[in-house]
Design a protein with these regions (language model features):
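Core catalytic region of metal-dependent phosphoesterases/phosphodiesterases
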Residues: 2-3, 9-15, 24-118
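Generic serine detector
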Residues: 10, 20, 29, 129-132, ...
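Active-site-proximal beta-strand elements of phosphoester/diester hydrolases
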Residues: 15-23, 121-128
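Conserved beta-sheet core of the metallophosphoesterase superfamily
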Residues: 102-111, 118-123, 128, 132-140
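Active-site-proximal loop/helix segment associated with metal-binding centers of metalloenzymes
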Residues: 125-166
Length: 169
């Protein structure tokens, strides 16, 4: 499926960009597409709404150059004066414990009040914070995350086999 992220009419066109559930470091992350979009649309404020990093797979890391480029881009934007707000998610409850190269230079919070251009106030939280814990336990969530990782790895391997088969036909 093609991805199109056209540049805005002016470089100041984006006041705020909200990013959620990027899962950088997970097998299914599409950091390459995200980076292209972030580079095309600079913003004054970046609100990172949880699960930016996927810190649940310490034994199965999948950190790519594209994942690192997204982190480097956001840190560079912050160094240039953009505001970065990091709202914790369930996959990154302690982002400051990420490996040094994967850390964003920002303080992580559980919730954030965002003020819009017309001064309305919006509460920003990660969706997992309001999920019902009666239906889903922490252990079940961890098992589901591991199963997802393994299925993505299997899918990637099968796709490679199909490509190899096509090349030999």
């Amino acid at each position: 499926m093609p991805f199109d992220c056209p540049a805005p009419p002016s470089r100041a066109a984006c006041r705020t960009v909200f990013l959620s559930d990027l899962h950088l470091g997970a097998m299914g992350s599409r950091a390459d597409l995200l980076l292209a979009c972030l580079q095309a649309r600079p913003a004054d404020i970046y609100v990172l709404v949880g699960d930016i990093l996927d810190l649940w797979q310490p034994l199965l890391p999948h950190w790519t150059a594209a994942d690192q480029a997204v982190i480097d881009h956001l840190n560079a934007r912050a160094a240039a004066g953009a505001d970065l707000v990091y709202v914790r998610g369930n996959h990154d409850p302690e982002p400051d414990r990420a490996p040094p190269h994967a850390r964003l230079h920002v303080r992580a919070v559980c919730e954030h009040i965002h003020r819009t251009g017309d001064q309305r106030r919006l509460l920003v939280v990660h969706g997992d914070s309001v999920d019902s814990r009666l239906v889903r336990t922490h252990l079940a969530t961890r098992i589901g995350s591991l199963a997802n990782h393994l299925l993505l790895r299997l899918d990637r391997g099968l796709r490679r086999l199909v490509e190899i088969g096509r090349a030999h036909v």
